[in-house]
Amino acid sequence: VCALSEAKGMTKTMIEKIADDLIGQMTEARLIDKEMEARYVYVFICWIEKFITVGSIIVISLMFHKLFPTIFFLVFFLELRKRTGGYHLDKFYRCYLASIVSYLVIVIISEKLSEHPQWLFAIVLLAITGIGLIGTANHPNMHMTSDELMESKKSARTIVLLEGCIILGCVLLDADMVYVSYMAIAVILCAALLCIAKIFKQEVKE
């Protein structure tokens, strides 16, 4: 257990060090504003962590023979998530484990939800409504300005409406319900994380 904890700590430190070094060099070369350095470090760390997490999910999807539904899920989730924001765990390993466990749960429940589409549609409609009302959670690490937050909320509402239309179109075209369930669950998960961020006040007040 101790060895595992140390390994997790080393991973986080290594990711932060890579980000600090790279962004520091770009700041020295005047490619990045000094005032924006902290934000760029945060975004770069997010990119590395996302690469590790998404890579792991794709590998697991191959094991379950769910690669293509998973790709649809990831596209829907990542496109919406980067605009809505939402709850973040404070450590990468926690976020990573939560993501993997969440994906495994999705693999299990997607089969059940695809057999009961009325429940799936009711929940995704509620999720779309929630995102439409809230829009975006302004995470403390991003600390968006009022204009940036307004633009992000507008983008989130546009994307969730677009994704909702795609899901509806797939249903009308009688597409495989497994694919539909993965796309719908992506929207539902984004809405859930957005609501959790609001509940736990993990945001900068406007």
Give residue ranges: language-model regions.
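Short helix-perturbing small/polar motifs within transmembrane alpha-helices
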Residues: 99-141
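C-terminal ends of transmembrane helices
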Residues: 77-88, 136-144, 198-199
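Membrane-helix boundary/juxtamembrane motif in polytopic membrane proteins
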Residues: 139-162
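Interfacial aromatic-anchored transmembrane helix boundaries in multi-pass membrane proteins
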Residues: 82-98, 104-105, 109
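Hydrophobic alpha-helical transmembrane segments in multi-pass integral membrane proteins
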Residues: 106-119, 161-177
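Cytoplasmic-side transmembrane-helix entry/capping segments in multi-pass membrane proteins
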Residues: 90-101, 119-125, 148-154
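Structural signature of hydrophobic alpha-helical transmembrane segments
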Residues: 61-73, 120-127
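Hydrophobic transmembrane alpha-helices
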Residues: 20-69, 79
